[in-house]
Amino acid sequence: MFPLLERYTSDLGGPNTQRGHVDDPTHKQILVNAKICPIINAPSWREEKGLMDRFWSIFTLGRFGVADSLGAYDFYNEDEVVVATSAEEYIELSEYYIKNVDKQLPFIEKIQKRIREEYNWYYTWRHILENIE
């Protein structure tokens, strides 16, 4: 992320940042106003192909981010989500979508549609209950 931070204005909150910790409403406002929202998993999550809750929060808010875990493909097809598999590719894709915000919308819409229709508590519990023997 450091190359992007050097080239673009950013609003970072959290430990060891100039802003420090932010409350939930402030965090939501930062995400809503961002051109791109980083979705960077811990190395262990990437290794296990996990997908942290930040992914879901960002897209639920109608924002966009490049994911760094192949675990995104467990939920979405390649035409529905943008995934980078190296730091260089992550920077390259992030910069592309910062400069081309209009290209984000199809991904946001596809992911939100699937969240509404498939990845919610109602769907999950119905699926669990239907499959209990």
PLM features per residue range, with description:
Residues 78-84, 96:
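A short acidic/histidine/glycine-rich donor-binding loop in glycosyltransferase catalytic cores
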Residues 87-103:
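C-terminal "capping" alpha-helix adjacent to the active site of nucleotide-linked donor transferases
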Residues 98-132:
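A charged, aromatic-enriched C-terminal amphipathic alpha-helix characteristic of glycosyltransferases
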Residues 30, 93-96, 131:
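CheY-like receiver
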Residues 22, 85-88:
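Short beta->alpha linker loops
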Residues 54, 93, 110-111:
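Short, hydrophobic/aromatic alpha-helical segments in well-folded domains
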Residues 1-78, 125:
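Nucleotide-sugar donor-binding catalytic core of glycosyltransferases
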